Swiss-Prot record:
PROSITE patterns: RADICAL_SAM (PS51918)
Subunit-structure text: Consists of two subunits, CofG and CofH.
Protein name per Swiss-Prot or TrEMBL: 7,8-didemethyl-8-hydroxy-5-deazariboflavin synthase
InterPro entries: Aldolase_TIM, CofG_family, Elp3/MiaA/NifB-like_rSAM, F420, rSAM
Record pathway: Cofactor biosynthesis; coenzyme F0 biosynthesis
């Protein structure tokens, strides 16, 4: 499909363009069988009412005319052996179908999936995501000791499975949870090696641990300089086709965003009304962010939740949805 050529979308590494995804988050359930000590999201299994389709539709109607493109379906994890797992999977599919029917582009992040689950979601999402977090097994004795699905080899297998299936994929590192600099490098190298095999990873999120009021154990925040250093290392390790993302609402120092961009970050992720994972850190006003970046010589532009060079991997039905949004973004760009 020629709409997705490099002539339409310049590589962010070769321009002054900083991208973001105009997004809205739907949470099918906050219940999760993992107990990560730093989590500000989860509720105990059976203690949360699942999101109904009618409620989801009502919420999406409120943002339909606000320029929102991506519907991020971000879910707590129902145990793979739970009798509710099949119903949970079906709710994920139904929410993605609803988003498509209402003119949005869905992206789902719901933890590790078996092959059949991933294929089912592949058919109704323009991309999928899962944070690799850190590959070191040491964290299974500390922050992840009560989080079975944070097994690093299980999560790395998810990246491989997505690659085998040809799914555009987002992954990332959680920084400042007890890992070493060497651990970070090895995690980045593993992502790069997986991408070399399949060419499916579109972006890597570098997310600094940011303490919140709901977490079980208070861990210190990541030092600002460590994030900047990690961005620079990631830009050296990862192929240029993989965008490096930093979440601007988690950058607490005034100069930190500028320094991360200078080190090679080119994407700000989903700008949403409410950060479900980090509820104590809300996003800045988009117009103010755009103006601040412009003063530094950057141009903030919206993007799709699937990167242009990976659109051809999508089912034809999803490519049609993507083409409509790309035409819309291009029209907005020409008129601005």
């Amino acid at each position: 499909m020629k709409h997705f050529s490099d002539q339409t979308w310049r590589s962010p590494q070769q321009s002054a363009v900083i991208t973001y995804s105009p997004a809205y988050t739907l949470v099918p359930t906050y219940e999760c069988f993992n107990r990560c000590t730093y989590c500000n999201f989860r509720r105990d299994p059976g203690m949360d009412e699942w999101l109904s389709l009618s409620t989801a539709q009502q919420r999406l109607l409120t943002v339909r005319d606000r320029g929102v493109c991506e519907v991020l379906i971000l879910s707590g994890e129902v145990h793979p052996q739970s009798p509710r797992r099949a119903a949970w999977r079906q709710r994920l599919i139904e929410l993605a179908e609803l988003a498509l029917d209402m003119g949005f582009l869905p992206h789902t992040n719901a933890g590790p999936l078996n092959r059949a689950e991933m294929i089912a979601l592949q058919n109704v999402n323009v991309s999928l995501g899962l944070m690799l977090e850190q590959l070191t097994p040491q964290l299974q004795r500390t922050v992840h000791r009560a989080a079975p699905s944070k097994d690093p080899q299980l999560r790395l297998q998810q990246l491989e499975q997505a690659g085998e299936l040809g799914i555009p994929f987002t992954t990332g590192l959680l920084l400042g949870i007890g890992e070493t600099s060497r651990d970070r490098l090895e995690t980045l190298e593993a992502i790069a090696a997986c991408h070399d095999r399949w060419g499916h990873i579109q972006e890597v999120i570098l997310q600094p641990h940011s303490p919140g009021r709901q977490q079980a154990i208070q861990h210190p925040p990541l030092a600002p300089d460590e994030l900047i250093d990690c961005v620079a290392i990631a830009r050296q390790v990862l192929p240029t086709s993989i965008a490096i993302q930093v979440p601007p609402n988690l950058l607490t120092q005034p100069q930190q965003l500028a320094d991360c961009l200078g080190a090679g970050a080119r994407d700000l992720g989903g700008i949403v009304p409410y950060d479900e994972v980090n509820p104590d850190y809300q996003h800045h006003d988009l117009d103010e962010l755009r103006e601040a970046l412009a003063q530094q010589g950057w141009q903030l532009q919206p993007r799709l939740p699937v990167y242009p060079h990976l659109v051809d991997r999508l089912p034809q039905r999803l490519q049609t949805h993507v083409a409509a949004w790309l035409n819309r973004f291009n029209s907005q760009s020409r008129s601005s």
